[in-house]
Design a protein with these regions (language model features):
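Short, conserved DNA-binding cores of transcription-related domains
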Residues: 1-83, 88-89
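Short, amphipathic alpha-helical "recognition" segments used to contact nucleic acids or chromatin
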Residues: 98-113
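Residue-level detection of the helix-turn-helix DNA-binding "recognition helix"
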Residues: 44, 123, 134, 138
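Short, basic interhelical loop/turn and adjoining N-cap
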Residues: 116-132
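RNase H-like nuclease fold core
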Residues: 133-167
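Residue-level signal for the short linker/turn that defines the boundary of a DNA-recognition helix
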Residues: 37, 113-114
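Short, Lys/Arg-enriched anionic-surface-contact patches
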Residues: 82-102
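Short flexible coil/turn linkers enriched for glycine and charged/polar residues
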Residues: 22, 112, 159-162
């Protein structure tokens, strides 16, 4: 649709098909530019679309207006695995109703204020904000743990290298 809108959205292989505004909300209908997806089990590409069910997810606000993205949730059939899989998306976690960047934004806002305050500002329930906060916390904790263990492994390897290297 609009190259500037696509550039602002910053999602790979996605274009904005249409844009609508209603009350204080913006709705962007997205379309994927790629016709295939990678199977989650065998990692092979499949272009055999089984079904397409659009869903509505919330994204960061645009100019102070609540923003929703209507995205196609595509399910493909993999001939190698003989099974169906739902396309994974880089901008949202599986089973979530919000973009990753919106969830990260909410997580940061809660750290600066409180769940109650963010709940009022974003017009989401306390339970929703708390669930998003816990989800983001778990992701960050897992990521920090992986980074810590990778760092420890590197340090361990460096110590071994200095012990075995000739001086």
């Amino acid at each position: 649709m609009d190259i500037q809108l696509d550039a602002l959205l910053k999602f790979p292989h996605v274009t904005v098909e249409s844009c609508a505004q209603q009350d204080n909300e913006v709705y962007l209908k997205l379309r994927f530019l790629n016709e295939e997806a990678r199977c989650l089990r065998c990692e092979k590409l499949s272009s055999e679309l089984h079904q397409n069910r659009p869903i509505l997810i919330r994204d960061l606000s645009i100019f102070g207006q609540v923003t929703y993205l209507k995205i196609p949730r595509r399910q493909f059939y993999c001939h190698d695995c003989q099974g169906y899989f739902t396309e994974s998306l880089t901008f949202m976690d599986a089973g979530r109703q919000y973009t990753r960047r919106y969830e990260e934004h909410l997580y940061q806002q809660v750290q600066l204020s409180s769940i109650e305050q963010v709940s009022r500002v974003e017009r989401l329930s306390f339970d929703r904000i708390e669930g998003i906060f816990k989800h983001q916390y778990a992701l960050k904790k897992k990521q920090d743990g992986q980074e810590s263990s990778a760092l420890a492994l590197m340090k361990s390897a460096n110590v071994k290298d200095t012990k075995t290297s000739p001086q």
